[in-house]
Swiss-Prot record:
The lineage of its organism: Eukaryota, Metazoa, Chordata, Craniata, Vertebrata. Residues 293-367 form the AGC-kinase C-terminal domain. GO terms for molecular function: ATP binding; potassium channel regulator activity; protein serine kinase activity; protein serine/threonine kinase activity. Its EC number is 2.7.11.1. Keywords: ATP-binding, Cytoplasm, Kinase, Nucleotide-binding, Nucleus, Phosphoprotein, Serine/threonine-protein kinase, Transferase. This is Serine/threonine-protein kinase Sgk2. It catalyses: L-seryl-[protein] + ATP = O-phospho-L-seryl-[protein] + ADP + H(+); L-threonyl-[protein] + ATP = O-phospho-L-threonyl-[protein] + ADP + H(+). The modification Phosphothreonine is found at residue 193. It is found in: Cytoplasm; Nucleus. It is an enzyme of class 2 (transferase). Activated by phosphorylation on Ser-356 by an unknown kinase (may be mTORC2 but not confirmed), transforming it into a substrate for PDPK1 which then phosphorylates it on Thr-193. It comes from Mus musculus.
Amino acid sequence: MASSPVGVPSPQPSRANGNINLGPSANPNARPTDFDFLKVIGKGNYGKVLLAKRKSDGAFYAVKVLQKKSILKNKEQNHIMAERNVLLKNVRHPFLVGLRYSFQTPEKLYFVLDYVNGGELFFHLQRERRFLEPRARFYTAEVASAIGYLHSLNIIYRDLKPENILLDCQGHVVLTDFGLCKECVEPEETTSTFCGTPEYLAPEVLRKEPYDRAVDWWCLGAVLYEMLHGLPPFFNTDVAQMYENILHQPLQIPGGRTVAACDLLQGLLHKDQRQRLGSKEDFLDIKNHMFFSPINWDDLYHKRLTPPFNPNVEGPADLKHFDPEFTQEAVSKSIGCTPDTVASSSGASSAFLGFSYAQDDDDILDS
């Protein structure tokens, strides 16, 4: 499994009293008791992801439950804001997970997300070791489409890895986890925060140089390499040596790859971000590469292409593609409990003003 993200920045409060306004409170009345929490399906630094069933209509969702105390202790309010803001923008893209609700109690934050149960790309790679080129091309194209969309919104993703790439029940990609995204980065602008996951860090990040959206194309190259060869391109169990490899070791591509695949990997994994594929025309550079010549991008976007792998899930309750380490864990009763008031206006809750959100009724009905 890839290492945990490193170098998460410590954001500054946006107001003198430390309160963060996370947007309009369109759904102030939602509460945990609206859902039956069935299984733990994932875990993170500040909480868990659970499979939940909405009592009113039986709809299934993935609910990310975060502990406010942990977030406040680590001064991560701004990251929660950034993740929520990015999630709101993702609703209309086919390969990005959508946010349906967000609400809070005095102790916890709740993200109610689209539920997909085809498993993490990481899960399937661990089981199969590597993919053939057509399958790797399909996943890479869908991920590139999602990354290109984020870039069009001036968002750098910064944490692309197999664990953050899910498959839906049909086998299409769903990109998730936007906690390290950087918003408001214009095409010619840079940022400099040291963050990401060690195996996938670009050289410019390791050198602590200003970097731009080309950092995401490096990560895409690293994920493609791993899909084709079973490990990230410069992997070493010694993290310091791995960093040295990323910075200085020439890219080594094992035999058996097509010329197009080798050329794409060399372009994406160019150590000079100014020469990297994607540094000039961003997603268009990727889209027009010969490796993707079999792809009709309009058909891809509209999910008219048949995925190369079908997860064969038997309905929402089928959890065979989730790690048993998670699914066998007991669901805490406190997650589904709620006080008489959904969230107080003082203490921890005041640091997350306006967190609550709900889609328009039309959006929910269309989904």
